[in-house]
Amino acid sequence: MKPFSAIREIARQLLRDEFQGDADQEFADDELDLHINKVLVEISNKRPYEVKETVESDGTREIALDAIKDLIGDKVIRVEYPTGNYPPSELKFSIFGNTLTLESKPTSGEYIYLYCHKVHQVTESASTLSPDLEEVLIEGVVASAGTAFLNNTRKQIVPSSMRLYQAWVDRQSINYQISLNQITRPKAWEF
C-alpha cells in the first residue's frame, strides 16, 4: 500500500518534475492531487471499492443514502435484513434519488446491511487499492497531468519539440487506457 504522497511523488518522477536546485516544479502538489482524485473515480467506475455499510433502522421502510459518502454506479447492490442469518437474508428494495425503500418494514433499532459500491480512497495511512490498481492509478495520473501540461504550454513549445511531447503524452494515455480497460472485477462465489 502506497500512501497518497508516495503516489504523487512517483507520478512526479515519471513526469520528470523532481525538485532540482532553484528550479520550480511544473506541477504543484494540489494540481497533481486533482489528477489523482480524477483517476481514482475512473478506476472506481471499473472496479469499485466494495463495502458493507451498517445502518440502524428508524422503524420506516426508507433509508436516506445521503449519509453514505462516495457511493457510485448502482450505489447499493443488495440489502441484508434481518442480519446474522446463514445464508444471508436478502431483502428486495428500490432506489429513487437518494432514498432506498425496503420491501418490508424493519423494527426500529435493528441493523440493516447495505452492500455498496464506493469510490476508492487513498490517504497517508490507508488505501483501498490493490497493488495492481495503484499502478493503474500512477499511469493515469501521469497521462492526465501530461495532457494538462501539454495543453497549457502548447503555444510556448516550438513545433518540432511539440511533436515529441505529443507523442509521449499519447503513449502515456494509450498505456493508461489499456490498463484501465483490463481492469475486471474479481470472480466471487454466489451463495
Task: Give residue spans per PLM region.
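Internal mixed-charge
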Residues: M1-Q13, D30-L34, K38-S44, P88-F191
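Ser/Thr- (and often Asn-) enriched beta-sheet segments in non-cytosolic proteins
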Residues: K52-A64, R78-E80, K92-S94, T99-T101, ...
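Surface-exposed ligand/attachment interfaces on beta-rich extracellular proteins
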Residues: V55-K69, T123-P131
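Solvent-exposed beta-hairpin/edge-strand motifs
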Residues: D66-G84
